[in-house]
Amino acid sequence: SNSKADIKEGKATYTNDKGEVTTAKVKLKNGDLEEVEIDETAQGKDKSKKALGNDYQMKQASKIGKEWYEQIDFLEKYIEKKGVDSIKLNKEGKAENNDVTSGCTIRIDGFLKAVKEAEKNAK
């Protein structure tokens, strides 16, 4: 068919109780979530957590031995495949799904809020 895909992009932010700001960007294709990008400012640092990479030094403290950007990469791919609403959260704002916690054990409630908001804002 020669119909052009309907591509929409949206962006949103969420600020947590530590004052760290999450930015979520999404790309929708024909109404379906195709791309998700999540990043967050790091307290007292002039680079984002993604930009800090291994220098953010979460790996040592991580139950699954993964740095922040690695856990977020996993989460982004999961959301692209299964959507935000497929993720169940516990009271701490962390995922309960085993197929999420295998790659992402950090608190993600704010990230999910930002992604949902970005989807709403997609134009």
Task: Mark where each language-model region is.
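Sec-dependent signal peptide cleavage junction
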Residues: 1-3
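Active-site- and interface-proximal helix/loop "cap" or "latch" segments in soluble metabolic
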Residues: 7-9, 14-123
